[in-house]
Amino acid sequence: MASARNGVSKDELLPVYERRSQRDGDISGSVKSFASTIGNSASAAVLAYCLSSISMTLVNKYVVSGASWNLSFLYLAMQSFIGTVAILACKKTGLIQNLALFDLKKAQTWLPISLLLVGMIYTGNKALQFLSVPVYTIFKNLTIIVIAYGEVLMVGGGVKPLALLSFGLMVLSSVVAAWADIQNATTATVGASSDSTAAALSALNAGYAWMGTNVIFSASYALGMRRVIKKTNFDNWDVMFYNNLLSIPILLLASVLAEDWSSENLQRNFPAELRQSLFIGILYSGVAAVFISYCTAWCVRATSSTTYAMVGALNKLPLAVAGIVFFAAPVTFGSVSAIVLGFISGLVYARAKSTGA
């Protein structure tokens, strides 16, 4: 009472360390409250998913777009190694709490899926090397069609009318994109030698061939993973960990056998003036692959699978626009029409998934 009469508060009578502990507890509580708010925010989840997936595609395009680039297996091995280290670091710090210990038997069961993943990411990077980001994005929609009919063959059932309409729009957008690409290639080489035109068309044909192969690998990976994941009882982080870990020796072996590791070739692939930015891109892509996996689960948890499907459809447009902005992809009536058709097809497909029509 005397202290109160003398104008000294109760808090001032507490020992310094107790007041500091109380203050730190208040700050910690505020941080946890803010983190909880963000974690349950649908807007934050959608934004994080969109930014991570767009940036990942753009960084991959940047790394593999060098005129002399021919070390895709090595690049992907580095990416997988960085992803594995990032996952283990997250587990060590407590950010990931449900990652099980490595199981050799489960690894053997999962190995065929990792082989399909290697095929998927390698062919995807090769397609990006020859095709523009908008065209790559549009053709990627074809994977949805192959998966849908693969599921029909595996589990029966059929494809509903609205889904069929979306598939038709996807095919049409791909045809328009290819037509616009070929028109641009021939127009850009007008006045040049016939060899230049032939080289441009040859590069496009290589890109389409890699894209077609990527669609097959992507669909096979998705369909195979759904079957094997039931046997292993993996969650999202287990899938990410085993995919990255098992891919490393496969990719390294493929790189040693198929790629040139001479100092001259390494110099051509990583020129001194671009070396730092390329390595930053490789580091980012490895970490971003883990972040995309987290954001996918976050988006589904904070919203719904229907909203996630819709976001995936809407994400095609900013990704295509980003490709035009950052890599100067040609803007023509054909290319814009293909992007719009691809965007609409994604919306129709998301609607078909949500209504079952």
From Swiss-Prot:
Cellular compartment(s): Golgi apparatus membrane; Cytoplasmic vesicle membrane; Endoplasmic reticulum membrane
Keyword Cytoplasm: no
Mode of membrane association: Multi-pass membrane protein
Cited InterPro entries: SCL35B1-4/HUT1, TPT_transporter
Pfam families (alphabetical): UAA (PF08449)
Domain of life: Eukaryota
Transmembrane segments: 34-54, 69-89, 108-128, 130-150, 162-181, 197-217, 237-257, 278-298, 307-327, 333-352
Gene Ontology cellular component annotations, sorted alphabetically: cytoplasmic vesicle membrane; endoplasmic reticulum membrane; Golgi membrane
Keyword Transport assigned: yes
Keywords: Cytoplasmic vesicle, Endoplasmic reticulum, Glycoprotein, Golgi apparatus, Membrane, Sugar transport, Transmembrane, Transmembrane helix, Transport
Assembly, per entry: Homooligomer.
Function: Involved in the import of GDP-mannose from the cytoplasm into the Golgi lumen.
Name of this protein: GDP-mannose transporter 2
Protein source organism: Neosartorya fischeri (strain ATCC 1020 / DSM 3700 / CBS 544.65 / FGSC A1164 / JCM 1740 / NRRL 181 / WB 181) (Aspergillus fischerianus)
Phylogenetic placement of the source organism: Eukaryota, Fungi, Dikarya, Ascomycota, Pezizomycotina
Gene: gmt2
